[in-house]
Amino acid sequence: MRENSESSVACHHRVGFLGLLVTLGIVFGDIGTSPLYVMKAILHTGETINQNTILGALSCIIWTLTLQTTIKYVCVALRADNNGEGGILALYALLRKMKRKWIYLLAIIGASTLLADGIITPAITVTTAIEGLESISSHLPVIPITLGIITIIFFVQRFGTESIGKSFGVFMLIWFLLLGVMGAFSITSYPLILKAINPYYAIVLLTQSPEWFLILGAVFLCTTGAEALYSDLGHCGRKNITISWLFVKAMLILNYLGQGAWVLNHIQTASSVNPFFSIMPQSMLIFAIIMATGAAIVASQALISGTFSILSEAMNLHFWPRMRIKHPTHVKGQLYIPVINLAMYIGVVLIILLFRDSSHMEAAYGLAITITMLMTTLLLGFYLRTKGVARIFILLFMGAYCVIEGIFLAANLSKFLAGGWCTMLIGGILFLMMYVWVHAIKIRQHYISTKPLDDYYQIISDIKADESIPKYACNLVYVNHANKEGAVDDKLLYSIINKQPKRADHYWLINLEFADTPDTLEYCCETLVPDTLYSITMRIGFRIEPRVSLYLRQVVEDLVASRKVDLRSTYPSLRKNGIPGDFRFIIIHRVYYPESSNNRQQNLLMTIYALIGKIGIDEPKALGLDTSMVVVERVPLIINQHNRSIRRIAQMEEEK
């Protein structure tokens, strides 16, 4: 049983003009809009503007793009794929069977900070683009226009972006050409700016400038979109991203150099304007603002879609509660999560209203994504170890990038009070939610008691044959939460045998296994008692929704076609007309009672878990079951059973 919707993805993976064009529209929106605010942020650090400062800052930008984006992500991370998929959670899925059980912490820290970055990116990119209007008139309402565009971006998510998404690649191609051409044109006014390619100027700046920490914090903004290259690996493929990056990097560097040239030609006024718009000819300013706004929308769209994908993966990895996921288009992988869309919209609006302009947002930007990159570095080190890479290379790689990213982290921490606290607060809340969810699931799983299933074959067969028991359903389906082969959840047996004996023609036990690979969707079926009891194991990839009803229907059709089971109704009037028997699902839901445990920390964790669960959906919907065919049986989750003996007395005495 496998999904058959790979053709569009395979098309995007082919190296060719179309594949490269699609890659430009999907992958490079975030990093491609960095020129809107990086140089402006550098000029606002308070460092004296002179040739050495600008050459040093530009050299830092060029070598950050080279070391961080090109070498770490393009050359190394893109090779660490999970069946073609990339991103920090896909990387973790490859490693979660390692003996180091704490490795999940790296994944949820990285995912939390990456999601926090997804709140600030739409705010700063759209705001900076609209602020270009101030070059035309200082009286234009930047904030209302920005909020209007943000509202439209989030509103259209429910309809999908398939139709306009096809044009993103063409738009971004024009955008990058605009960056490169305008940058190259500006360079001609100050050719000495090309000296910034020499890393010597970066070293001089970092060793001599008293404001080097602040400058590095601003420089880091040029590579914040690097993580997207890795996260979008599954959409476009390694070769398309690698080849496209050569073009994108060249255009970005030309634009940064062009902005630097303009600054050195206008040292007195440079800090009061945005150099990005200043290098544009006056006749092209409106066009540049429109293009910048469009690029900001593309970048925002990529971040929103990326957030949906990350949380979808987190659900199957048991990092996040199940939520209602919609598929607004037929494009594979395009998701829409209504609750998250609303939460992101509120978050972005609050960021815009709180910081008011892009200069203040720059202080909030960069800190969270630095932590994500550091977590990716650590996970990559473990991955390289599993691939048998020489230990000396792993130590050099991890040591070098832990130092580089550690310095960037320290530099960005200098902006904590000015705004960095905001994304760290968001990331901290998300981390707490994931941490609680992971541990609560472990607690629930730990206290599920199981029994050997084969001990109950006979009694289940006897119940089926006992016509004095009213027939509950023709086909009775349970999801078995026992994670041991040959075992069954004892509450499941209690439901069939003790609570209300349930007679059925066939009993089906569904075992769900979430695979470490992204697109796995397969099953195996074992007949435990002929014509009575069946066990179906479904293996589901971490990017696939567990739509159990749909998959079971396909499984049953396969079994009927191969004549391994006869599902025609046992009622004579229905059987002679070939009508199949009905299906009924029973879900065993364990309810945690704090008074069953003396562990206060555990009680607090489970209480928070219950609160977090309210933002999700119930188990029948989470498993994609037809709720009209589902019965939920609630049972207590017993942690520590306190059995107190009751004393027998001869006669009750009256109370005085």
Question: What is the predicted function of each stretch?
Answer:
Residues 2-656:
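The structured alpha-helical core of multi-pass membrane proteins
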